[in-house]
Amino acid sequence: MKKLTFGTPEALVPSVFCDGFQYTERPIHYAVDRIRFKTTARGCRLEFPMQPGEQIFGLGLQLKIFNLTHRQMVTRVNSDPISATGDSHAPVPFFVSTAGYGIYFDTARYVEFDFGRPRAGRPSQYEGEREIAVSTETLYAQRELAGEVTIAANIPAARGVDIYIIEGETITDIVSQYNMLSGGGCSVPEWGLTPFYRCCSRYSQEQILETAKYLREHDMPVGILGLEPGWQTRA
């Protein structure tokens, strides 16, 4: 793990308010000399190299999307996200890559990410995009951008930022290091990590128990069962 400072970071950032913030520097293999940084009238911008076939995941709780590759995302707080734009109850400016690294941006600003952008001046073209899809596999295959592409991060109003580059053999290892960096945390019960299911708010106790029985008999890994709350009808 390595901390890199670009420009003049802001004073009020998440790490300042994290009593258990644990940064331990270790050598990394990431090509930091290929990171590009600049400030503009709008804020600051960083660009990171991206390898062919590299896949990106993360940005905290994301309800509408899992794989962020070739997507534009904004880590914006929103209690009712309706599309896969990065809006979330709990967005985090941290992503992980299948190339063996993750990057945390120590900023409280909304960060605008572009995961797979052609270098400036290069056309946005996909490998084999002239080929006609004639099967399900080719139609839904992960497309790769032709030429050199980057990961871009724009931070409006900021004149700089600290980033933490974390490396590991697996995504789990990278996320574990991020968890320790951000202060660790208590272990949650196993059922708390399972899917939840909400029954109709008018269900009786017998109907709820029957639903629970059905889920178990069909090996559905639901660990939390509840009722639809009615959504503020009598708040």
Model-predicted regions and their roles:
Residues 193-199, 225-229:
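Aromatic-lined carbohydrate-recognition surfaces of secreted/lumenal glycan-active proteins
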Residues 1-189, 199-201, 205-206, 212-217:
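Catalytic and substrate-binding clefts that recognize carbohydrates or anionic sugar/phosphate headgroups
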Residues 47, 221-235:
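Aromatic- and carboxylate-enriched substrate-binding clefts and catalytic-loop regions
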Residues 188-193, 220-223:
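Loop/turn elements at helix/coil->beta-strand transitions in domains of secreted/extracellular proteins
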